[in-house]
Amino acid sequence: MYNTEDIKQLLIEKYKNQDFRVTKSGVKTVELQNVQFIADKDYILREPNYDYIKREIEWYESQSLNVYDIPGETPAIWKACADVNGDINSNYGWMIWSKENGSQYNNCIWHLVNDPATRNAVMIYTRPSMHVDATSNHKHDFCCTHYVHCFLNPTDDGYSLKYIVYQRSQDSIFGYNNDINWHLYVYKMMVKELSEKLKCPIKTELIECNVGSLHVYERHFKFLE
């Protein structure tokens, strides 16, 4: 399986070959489709902004569906995704913890505790109505994450936790950095909770990513040069 350095080199190669995908608005992108890799680093092309990541996770923890509740300055990208009132769909904390979205985190834990060999331990982020919800009230927010699939694999004294992320779309400059740090946060939480409930050690693994469209926008091509 590829790692983040492999992904970086694949993106650079496409850029050098001028293998572009052009959006409806005429913006060039470099895009990898249906790509699978190990998240051995928390960035691909540009180091993360940990101050912002901390604030975004705090907002996810709040489960607020309004971008103006993000601590500090609300990033322009979130303002662009939101409707006229600042409301969005993609608060990932709301998507995995809220009862309104099916208590995804709790259900995932329940499956793993009740049957460590289960294939049903998923956290479903998006929903069928996203086709309509994405643009309701002038939003531009079609959730980028489909779901997370977790497995417990036996070790000598307990289990290891495999955590696989399935993405519809991911920007390689900011999106991957922010998303993988969110998933690392949730992963550590799961390891602790599973260890307590199963009363055995839970070993960690590197997160695995499956992305339908992993891309770099034209305004960020300098990171490929």
Predicted regions and their residues:
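Terminal, non-catalytic protein-protein interaction segments that mediate quaternary/complex assembly
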Residues: 1-225
